[in-house]
Amino acid sequence: MGLLQEKLAKYDLPQKFMAQGVYPYFREIEGKQGTEVEMGGQHVLMFGSNAYTGLTGDERVIEAGIKAMRKYGSGCAGSRFLNGTLDLHVQLEKELAAFVGKDEALCFSTGFTVNSGVISCLTDRNDYIICDDRDHASIVDGRRLSFSQQLKYKHNDMADLEKQLQKCNPDSVKLIIVDGVFSMEGDLANLPEIVRLKHKYNATIMVDEAHGLGVFGKQGRGVCDHFGLTHEVDLIMGTFSKSLASIGGFIAADSSIINWLRHNARTYIFSASNTPAATAAALEALHIIQNEPERLNALWEATNYALRRFREAGFEIGATESPIIPLYVRDTEKTFMVTKLAFDEGVFINPVIPPACAPQDTLVRVALMATHTKEQIDSAVEKLVKAFKALDLL
């Protein structure tokens, strides 16, 4: 056994939880993802999906992907930089840019590679990147790959953000990067105050709308639109894997920024482009959410109903303002145990443990879709109450 294998063989945390019978990961889904799924031979309510609009199983989205595959084939066999650009990619980029209110957009193969590729090439050694300490891992990796000076501020603490900005050279680029909706806690960035500080310190703002697109704002245009601050935000990032029922991501900004990224973002230049099916599916989902406002209304009816039910049941749910509802456990082992008990009762939820959160903030994450019914929500709440009470968590 080599040194690397010897080192990695010591990592046995997954095996510990497997031995206890509470290991929650990599469960196989046997069919389409909707509000109910077949998983491991069991029929369960799905409250762990990011498909907020409920479009992953929509026949129109599926048919759009099939038609694109028939026309363009199964893949593009190259990067966007060379032979991998389809007219379909360009159409999606134009419509996304218009949707989020920016000059242009670029599509990437995944949301993760948007952040890791864009952030890493925007700044140099004399510049600064300032992040919320609960920003997504893709933002963390993007700033780590950059050569810039890196600062973090306490979660949604605007006084601490200002303190970090005061450390920066006033003549250097200062890029503030923030999740519009924080993916584990469900709360929103304090975008109005961030914009105020942007002007005070001549900074630039990038907002990750992964969990805001399709959820907030007019027609689901995102948190920036929700606050009426689209034109104050310099870069808007989004994904296709959530509300747009596909896989991929995009960055939208003014033409000068997009021109730079098109020729310098390594994850764009050196990755194969989005498949025709994925691109067409995202485009169709984008059309649907713009043309069916009742879908957004249904999402918020389900969300508000679930928030009320969980609060009434006595769960600690923090400051969430979104379809992401954290049920705090504050103990890693019990987080896995309550996830297992819930699954045995027929409810799939996601455990959140370090490094996705601080050790004292472990939780199970419930996520709502536009297609969830009150009956499904009531059933989930009832079963989660039972699971939490079994562990003396309620």
Curated annotation (Swiss-Prot):
Which EC class does it fall in?
Answer: transferase
Recorded metabolic or biological pathway in which this protein acts:
Lipid metabolism; sphingolipid metabolism
A Pfam short name: Aminotran_1_2
Q: Which residues carry this modification: N6-(pyridoxal phosphate)lysine?
A: 242
Q: Which PROSITE patterns match?
A: AA_TRANSFER_CLASS_2
Query: What would be an example GO MF term here?
Result: serine C-palmitoyltransferase activity
Q: Can you cite a GO biological process for this protein?
A: sphingolipid biosynthetic process
- Alphabetical keyword list: Acyltransferase, Lipid metabolism, Pyridoxal phosphate, Sphingolipid metabolism, Transferase
Q: What is its EC number?
A: 2.3.1.50
Q: Which domain of life is it from?
A: Bacteria
What is the required cofactor set for this protein?
pyridoxal 5'-phosphate
The residues the record assigns to binding pyridoxal 5'-phosphate are 111-112, 183, 211, 239
Cellular component per GO? membrane
Q: Which Gene3D superfamilies match?
A: Aspartate Aminotransferase, domain 1, Type I PLP-dependent aspartate aminotransferase-like (Major domain)
Question: How does a null allele present?
Answer: Abolishes sphingolipid biosynthesis and leads to cell lysis.
Reaction(s) this enzyme catalyzes, per UniProt: L-serine + hexadecanoyl-CoA + H(+) = 3-oxosphinganine + CO2 + CoA
Additional observations: The bacterial ceramide synthesis pathway operates in a different order from that in eukaryotes. Furthermore, phylogenetic analyses support the hypothesis that the bacterial and eukaryotic ceramide pathways evolved independently.
Q: What is this protein's function per UniProt?
A: Involved in de novo bacterial ceramide synthesis. Catalyzes the condensation of L-serine with palmitoyl-CoA (hexadecanoyl-CoA) to produce 3-oxosphinganine. Also capable of using alanine as substrate leading to the formation of 1-deoxysphinganine (1-deoxySa). Contributes to the levels of endogenous sphingolipids in its host.
Instruction: Give the matching NCBIfam families.
Output: SerpalmtaseCFB (NF047600)
Family as reported in the entry's similarity comment: Belongs to the class-II pyridoxal-phosphate-dependent aminotransferase family.
- Name listed for the protein in its UniProt record: Serine palmitoyltransferase
Protein source organism: Bacteroides thetaiotaomicron (strain ATCC 29148 / DSM 2079 / JCM 5827 / CCUG 10774 / NCTC 10582 / VPI-5482 / E50)
Question: Where is the organism placed in the taxonomic lineage, from the top?
Answer: Bacteria, Pseudomonadati, Bacteroidota, Bacteroidia, Bacteroidales
Whichever gene encodes this chain, its name is spt
